[in-house]
Amino acid sequence: RGDEVLTFVNRNLEPYRGYHVFMRALPDILAARPKAQVVIVGEDGVSYGKRPEAGGKWKDIFLNEVKDRLDLSRVHFTGRLPYDRLVDLMHVSRAHAYLTYPFVLSWSMVETLAAGTLVVGSNTAPVAEVIKDGVNGRLVDFFDIKGWSDTLTDALARPEAYVQMRQNARDMTRAKYDLRSVCLPQQIALLTRLERS
């Protein structure tokens, strides 16, 4: 985590998962952190919301909105990554932005916490159930673009200030979401109860 790598991951880059908010925060982040590199993972389709009414793709619409204020040589769109490469990316990421409307939490956020990456998440129901602000990550109001810029800039600038939060995130993930010791036994117990009833 020696490099200032900021990540954003979604199946598809669309408003439902906060792509528009993240892109609007990027110009100030990159202006404040001239060595930062941004890796954006996701395809340009739609998974949860609807397609743009005027046509086109959400990825391009929100990139075009801010591209004149970005150094595009520092913004890297990867498309979809296989699981192992995504996990590798989380291990080099200094900070990860995770936004979602109140909806199902993505498995990738849990994987990111498990990797010990600082997650700055939207203060929405599914995220706030997992991240406790200042304890195992940071929370920012979904539409607070300045809050996103400031919080992500600080995370890139002062990684030492977040060491304990990253460790707490790893510990919490292992304690609550480990497949072998927690999730699988709970699923088996649930199926056993259902079978008996």
Give the predicted meaning of each segment.
Residues 1-17, 23-28, 39-41:
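Conserved donor-binding/catalytic core segment of Leloir-type glycosyltransferases
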Residues 158, 179-197:
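C-terminal alpha-helical cap of glycosyltransferases
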Residues 133-134, 138-145, 154-159:
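Conserved acidic donor-binding segment of nucleotide-sugar-dependent glycosyltransferases
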Residues 8, 91-104, 117:
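Acidic donor-binding loop of glycosyltransferase active sites
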Residues 80, 88-93:
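Short alpha-helical donor nucleotide-sugar binding micro-motif in glycosyltransferases
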Residues 118-121, 131:
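Short hydrophobic beta-strand element within catalytic cores of glycosyltransferases
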Residues 45-46, 51-80:
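Nucleotide-activated donor-binding/catalytic signature segment of Leloir-type glycosyltransferases, i.e.
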Residues 87, 106-114, 128-129, 135:
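Short alpha-helical segment that forms part of, or immediately flanks, the ligand-binding pocket
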